[in-house]
Curated annotation (Swiss-Prot):
GO biological process, one term: response to oxidative stress
Catalytic activity of the protein: N(6)-[(R)-dihydrolipoyl]-L-lysyl-[lipoyl-carrier protein] + a hydroperoxide = N(6)-[(R)-lipoyl]-L-lysyl-[lipoyl-carrier protein] + an alcohol + H2O
Name the record gives this protein: Alkyl hydroperoxide reductase AhpD
Quaternary state and interactors: Homotrimer.
Keywords: Antioxidant, Disulfide bond, Oxidoreductase, Peroxidase, Redox-active center
Listed GO MF terms: alkyl hydroperoxide reductase activity; disulfide oxidoreductase activity; hydroperoxide reductase activity; peroxiredoxin activity
Catalytic residues, chain numbering: 130 (proton donor), 133 (cysteine sulfenic acid (-soh) intermediate)
InterPro entries: AhpD, AhpD-like, AhpD_core, CMD-like
PANTHER family: ALKYL HYDROPEROXIDE REDUCTASE AHPD
Source species taxonomy: Bacteria, Bacillati, Actinomycetota, Actinomycetes, Mycobacteriales
Domain of life, per lineage: Bacteria
Disulfide bonds: 130-133
EC number: 1.11.1.28
């Protein structure tokens, strides 16, 4: 199971994604933990079993057990937070004075470098389409000294993984009915 398997599974019309996936997996902008945590978290956020299985297997070879769990923790907490903050944003400030009352302890104690956890949360929030969370995580990353290039590379990784998941879902669905 690997990035190579995903590239091989992509249909011809997704050739750009195949090339982008190969490029992003060799990035020098992100360190290994940042890259593989971002890829794993983004894969889980796509909800595509094949993408998660393939990237998850390769991520396990490139991340410590603690980082692997933290990346999945970022997906879990952002699954809740992205819905909550995106929904609250739709309400145009009418509920901003109310306390969320949601437990988010993993954000304070992720078990890995907090900037890496923020990077993964930023990527997942991008996949999930929560503009409030994307902006908040980007701000935290920049305050922590993470460069614009690294933030942008994580965004590209999330976008590529999301595109791969959509292409594979389309191909699998059409193959099943065709």
């Amino acid at each position: 199971m690997s990035i190579e398997n995903l590239k091989a599974a992509l249909p011809e019309y997704a050739k750009d994604l195949k090339l982008n996936l190969g490029s992003i997996s060799r990035t020098t902008v992100l360190d290994e933990e940042q890259l593989w945590g971002t890829l794993l978290a983004s894969a889980a956020a796509t909800r595509n079993a094949q993408v998660l299985a393939e990237i998850g297997a390769e991520a396990a070879d490139n991340l410590s057990a603690q980082a692997y769990q933290a990346a999945l923790g970022a997906v879990s907490i952002m699954g809740m937070n992205n819905v909550f903050y995106r929904g609250r944003g739709f309400l145009e400030g009418q509920y901003d004075d109310l306390r969320a009352g949601l437990r988010m302890n993993i954000i304070a104690n992720p078990g890995v470098d907090k900037a890496n956890f923020e990077l993964w949360s930023f990527a997942v929030s991008s996949v999930n389409g929560c503009s409030h969370c994307v902006v908040a995580h980007e701000h935290t990353l920049r305050e922590a000294g993470v460069g614009r290039e690294a933030v942008f590379e994580a965004l590209k990784a999330a976008a590529i993984v999301c595109g791969v998941a959509q292409a594979l879902t389309a191909a699998q669905t059409l193959a099943a009915v065709g």
